[in-house]
Amino acid sequence: MARGINKVILVGNLGNDPDIKYTQGGMTITTISLATTSVRKDKDGNTQERTEWHRVKFFGKLGEIAGEYLRKGSQCYIEGSIRYDKFTGQDGQERYVTEIVADEMQMLGGRSDGGGMGGGGERPQRQTSQRQDYAPRRQTRQPSQSPQSSPPPMDDFADDDIPF
Protein backbone atom coordinates (compact mmCIF):
# COMPACT_ATOMS: atom_id res chain seq x y z
CA MET A 1 0.00 0.00 0.00
CA ALA A 2 1.29 3.47 -0.88
CA ARG A 3 2.24 5.68 2.04
CA GLY A 4 1.30 8.87 0.20
CA ILE A 5 2.47 11.14 -2.56
CA ASN A 6 4.35 14.40 -2.06
CA LYS A 7 4.84 15.83 -5.56
CA VAL A 8 5.09 19.47 -6.61
CA ILE A 9 5.35 20.78 -10.18
CA LEU A 10 6.03 24.48 -10.73
CA VAL A 11 6.69 26.67 -13.76
CA GLY A 12 7.66 30.21 -12.91
CA ASN A 13 10.24 32.97 -12.95
CA LEU A 14 13.09 33.63 -10.52
CA GLY A 15 12.62 36.71 -8.37
CA ASN A 16 16.33 37.04 -7.60
CA ASP A 17 19.68 35.47 -8.45
CA PRO A 18 20.29 32.06 -6.84
CA ASP A 19 21.79 31.94 -3.33
CA ILE A 20 24.57 29.33 -3.30
CA LYS A 21 25.94 27.78 -0.10
CA TYR A 22 28.06 24.74 0.66
CA THR A 23 27.93 22.13 3.42
CA GLN A 24 31.07 21.31 5.36
CA GLY A 25 31.29 18.19 3.20
CA GLY A 26 31.34 20.31 0.04
CA MET A 27 27.78 19.64 -1.19
CA THR A 28 26.14 22.57 -2.97
CA ILE A 29 22.82 23.95 -1.70
CA THR A 30 21.22 26.51 -4.00
CA THR A 31 18.08 28.42 -2.99
CA ILE A 32 15.84 30.43 -5.30
CA SER A 33 12.58 32.35 -5.00
CA LEU A 34 10.22 31.30 -7.79
CA ALA A 35 7.10 33.29 -8.69
CA THR A 36 4.05 31.59 -10.17
CA THR A 37 1.06 33.60 -11.33
CA SER A 38 -2.47 32.30 -11.78
CA VAL A 39 -5.27 34.16 -13.53
CA ARG A 40 -8.99 33.91 -12.82
CA LYS A 41 -12.13 35.93 -13.37
CA ASP A 42 -13.95 37.43 -10.41
CA LYS A 43 -17.75 37.51 -10.03
CA ASP A 44 -17.92 40.69 -12.16
CA GLY A 45 -15.94 39.08 -15.00
CA ASN A 46 -12.77 41.07 -14.34
CA THR A 47 -9.44 39.29 -14.72
CA GLN A 48 -7.62 38.83 -11.42
CA GLU A 49 -3.98 37.75 -11.11
CA ARG A 50 -2.47 36.16 -8.04
CA THR A 51 1.27 35.66 -7.66
CA GLU A 52 2.64 33.08 -5.23
CA TRP A 53 6.29 33.01 -4.17
CA HIS A 54 7.94 29.64 -3.56
CA ARG A 55 11.27 28.96 -1.85
CA VAL A 56 12.99 26.20 -3.84
CA LYS A 57 16.15 24.34 -2.77
CA PHE A 58 18.47 22.35 -5.01
CA PHE A 59 21.08 19.97 -3.60
CA GLY A 60 24.32 18.51 -4.97
CA LYS A 61 24.94 18.52 -8.73
CA LEU A 62 21.49 19.97 -9.43
CA GLY A 63 22.35 22.80 -7.04
CA GLU A 64 25.58 23.46 -8.94
CA ILE A 65 23.72 23.60 -12.26
CA ALA A 66 20.95 25.84 -10.90
CA GLY A 67 23.50 28.19 -9.36
CA GLU A 68 25.49 28.42 -12.56
CA TYR A 69 22.73 28.82 -15.15
CA LEU A 70 19.70 30.39 -13.44
CA ARG A 71 19.44 34.15 -13.00
CA LYS A 72 16.83 36.66 -11.86
CA GLY A 73 13.98 36.57 -14.38
CA SER A 74 14.84 33.08 -15.68
CA GLN A 75 11.85 30.88 -16.37
CA CYS A 76 12.13 27.27 -15.27
CA TYR A 77 10.17 24.07 -14.69
CA ILE A 78 10.67 22.35 -11.34
CA GLU A 79 9.58 19.00 -9.94
CA GLY A 80 10.09 18.17 -6.31
CA SER A 81 8.43 17.72 -2.95
CA ILE A 82 7.11 20.15 -0.37
CA ARG A 83 8.66 20.30 3.08
CA TYR A 84 7.55 22.16 6.19
CA ASP A 85 10.15 22.92 8.86
CA LYS A 86 9.89 24.53 12.28
CA PHE A 87 12.77 26.18 14.12
CA THR A 88 13.38 28.63 16.94
CA GLY A 89 14.68 32.04 15.87
CA GLN A 90 17.36 34.02 17.66
CA ASP A 91 14.60 35.95 19.41
CA GLY A 92 13.22 32.72 20.89
CA GLN A 93 10.11 32.72 18.69
CA GLU A 94 9.10 29.58 16.82
CA ARG A 95 9.28 30.06 13.06
CA TYR A 96 7.85 28.00 10.25
CA VAL A 97 9.21 27.68 6.73
CA THR A 98 7.78 25.99 3.65
CA GLU A 99 10.22 24.86 0.97
CA ILE A 100 10.15 22.93 -2.26
CA VAL A 101 13.02 20.44 -2.48
CA ALA A 102 13.73 20.10 -6.19
CA ASP A 103 14.42 16.70 -7.74
CA GLU A 104 14.30 17.87 -11.36
CA MET A 105 14.73 21.19 -13.11
CA GLN A 106 14.39 22.29 -16.71
CA MET A 107 15.42 25.74 -17.90
CA LEU A 108 12.84 27.37 -20.16
CA GLY A 109 13.05 30.35 -22.48
CA GLY A 110 16.00 31.60 -24.48
CA ARG A 111 19.14 33.38 -23.45
CA SER A 112 17.41 36.75 -23.73
CA ASP A 113 14.97 35.60 -21.01
CA GLY A 114 17.87 34.96 -18.66
CA GLY A 115 17.25 31.23 -18.97
CA GLY A 116 20.91 30.53 -19.57
CA MET A 117 20.13 27.75 -22.03
CA GLY A 118 17.79 27.12 -24.90
CA GLY A 119 17.19 29.56 -27.72
CA GLY A 120 19.14 29.44 -30.96
CA GLY A 121 17.57 26.09 -31.82
CA GLU A 122 18.97 24.36 -28.75
CA ARG A 123 16.64 22.22 -26.67
CA PRO A 124 16.41 23.05 -22.95
CA GLN A 125 18.09 20.40 -20.85
CA ARG A 126 16.32 18.53 -18.09
CA GLN A 127 18.42 18.03 -15.00
CA THR A 128 17.79 15.55 -12.22
CA SER A 129 19.31 15.26 -8.81
CA GLN A 130 20.42 12.39 -6.67
CA ARG A 131 19.09 14.21 -3.60
CA GLN A 132 20.68 13.73 -0.22
CA ASP A 133 19.58 15.11 3.10
CA TYR A 134 21.62 18.13 3.97
CA ALA A 135 23.65 19.16 6.98
CA PRO A 136 22.58 21.83 9.50
CA ARG A 137 21.37 25.18 8.15
CA ARG A 138 24.28 27.42 9.13
CA GLN A 139 27.06 26.64 6.71
CA THR A 140 30.08 28.58 5.57
CA ARG A 141 31.17 28.95 1.99
CA GLN A 142 34.20 26.97 0.95
CA PRO A 143 37.31 28.87 -0.09
CA SER A 144 36.74 30.39 -3.48
CA GLN A 145 37.78 27.98 -6.18
CA SER A 146 36.82 27.99 -9.82
CA PRO A 147 35.40 24.49 -10.31
CA GLN A 148 35.77 23.15 -13.82
CA SER A 149 32.27 22.37 -14.96
CA SER A 150 31.26 20.79 -18.20
CA PRO A 151 28.05 21.65 -20.02
CA PRO A 152 25.07 19.33 -19.53
CA PRO A 153 25.08 16.35 -21.93
CA MET A 154 23.27 16.70 -25.25
CA ASP A 155 20.77 14.16 -26.58
CA ASP A 156 21.83 11.50 -29.11
CA PHE A 157 19.63 12.83 -31.91
CA ALA A 158 19.56 15.91 -34.12
CA ASP A 159 16.79 18.49 -33.91
CA ASP A 160 15.76 17.45 -37.45
CA ASP A 161 14.71 14.06 -36.02
CA ILE A 162 12.00 15.68 -33.87
CA PRO A 163 8.59 15.38 -35.61
CA PHE A 164 7.32 18.86 -34.67
UniProtKB/Swiss-Prot annotation:
Q: Single GO cellular component annotation?
A: nucleoid
Q: Which domain of life is it from?
A: Bacteria
Where the record places motif Important for interaction with partner proteins is: 159-164
Q: Which InterPro entries match?
A: NA-bd_OB-fold, Primosome_PriB/ssb, ssDNA-bd
- List the GO biological process terms: DNA recombination; DNA repair; DNA replication
Query: What task does this protein carry out?
Result: Plays an important role in DNA replication, recombination and repair. Binds to ssDNA and to an array of partner proteins to recruit them to their sites of action during DNA metabolism.
HAMAP family referenced in this protein's UniProt entry, alphabetically:
SSB
What is the name attached to this protein's record? Single-stranded DNA-binding protein
Q: Which organism is it from?
A: Xylella fastidiosa (strain Temecula1 / ATCC 700964)
